[in-house]
Amino acid sequence: MKLLAVRRLLRIQRVVIRYRLDDLLFDLPLPWFLLALRFALPWRWFPRKPLDLSRGARLRLALQDLGPIFIKFGQILSTRRDLLPEDIADELMLLQDRVPPFDSQKSVALIEAQLGKKISDVFSRFDIEPLASASVAQVHAAKLKTGEEVVVKVIRPGLKPIIAQDLAWLFILARAAEKLSADARLLHPVDVVSDYEKTIYDELDLLREAANASQLKRNFEGSPLLYVPQVYWDWCRPKVLVMERIYGIQVTDLATLADQRTDMKMLAERGVEIFFTQVFRDSFFHADMHPGNIFVSTVQPWSPQYIAIDCGIVGSLTPEDQDYLARNLFAFFKRDYRRVAQLHIDSGWVPAETKLNEFEAAIRTVCEPIFEKPLKDISFGQVLMRLFQTARRFNMEVQPQLVLLQKTLLNIEGLGRQLYPDLDLWNTAQPFLERWMRERVSPKAVLGNIHSQIEQLPHLANMTRDLLERMSQPHAADPPAPWHKRKDDWFLRLLGTAHLGGGAVLAAGGPLHELGHWPAGIMIAVGLYLIVRR
């Protein structure tokens, strides 16, 4: 193992030298003793032919040379435009996760070991030649004994030790960067690598991907917007996934879509509707919607339907984050920057002690130039990216789900405008957001909220005692927590439920009915405020 680690280190060193990445390092504001190291590196003692490549291209080519784990890390980095300069992020977007297929006999052996059966006992046909191959898995076409056409996804054998080794080096580099550079510390490189570690290990569990696909399929069951292939659970294992084989047109194959007389405007608008439906209705969204994972069914070209595959990466938002995201977008398009700043503070995305006026001014400086464009040309993804970049300067906590959301939105926008250049994203999304916000305060939603709070009523006495005990102990030095992270919030919502119940009793002719309906109205209003306030 140590020998492998040393060989890997030498490989990394050769790539660093080949692409002059040490030049990029020494261009950073490092301490003097580290800058002096440039004279101690033997390969810098001799003249070197200059590379006619940008810094982003050099980094991209280096990651490609280092192999699939580094390629995937670069792909994830490319979505962190709140952290990276645009020229580097643009280059990393070009990274392609394409690697040669592994030996198909190994694939067969792994499938048989996972299923505990011979291939011929499960499939009437199994194509040895893979349909596709990537860094984590490869896919074979097959036909079940019961007659269904399927695809079989198989995890590459021996992948975990390779991933562990490469992650170890990424952590070493990240920790070194945090120790050596104040600028690097602001980017939290160790946190970035930790997020990647979770993502890559999640992708190794195909049962997780199968569960994600089943959930997404259930959310859009019978919908003309999106189709998700069926999972055949009887034949799914941690390293094997069997799904319905789909037939569609790649979403970027514009010529074929045009030949089928596809309604491109509707297709683009449906992409936006799918995104906002996933985020706001379901709070569960496919977070890897790049062109390779999206196809189109043109059985009805006037009503085209998207087909989504590869649900290995998904995201979700809390109800509070959904609410603040929607309100942020509305405030931004009204150019109410103070409201945007206040929402960031209220949500806990930036520290409570942030100076509102300074934060508002920073948001205005960054976002006002965006409105030089026509409204239809404004990118939601760019808006979120600019807001996150600004908030990072005010110590915004890393929000992994919001980063996934921004990446997904940028993908959807890019595809939508490729399909239909005149796509007006705000005009398409605004009615959906307005309807969602109205539904948040509808009687049905309020009653549902009340029901969930009533379930907590048995704990009301204990919660009241705990709250009074906490209030009796001074914590002046502690900054106030964001409202949606306070435990006391449950108590206040329960109090609201009690007010609603009391108001209903009075309105029905309770003990104070001789005073008229105004006490009941006040109690109901206070109850509603405590329950749905933001």
From Swiss-Prot:
Keywords: ATP-binding, Cell inner membrane, Cell membrane, Kinase, Membrane, Nucleotide-binding, Transferase, Transmembrane, Transmembrane helix, Ubiquinone biosynthesis. Residues 125-492 form the Protein kinase domain. Is probably a protein kinase regulator of UbiI activity which is involved in aerobic coenzyme Q (ubiquinone) biosynthesis. This is Probable protein kinase UbiB. GO terms for cellular component: plasma membrane. The active site is at D288 (proton acceptor). SUPFAM superfamilies: Protein kinase-like (PK-like). It comes from Pseudomonas fluorescens (strain ATCC BAA-477 / NRRL B-23932 / Pf-5). It holds the Pfam family ABC1.
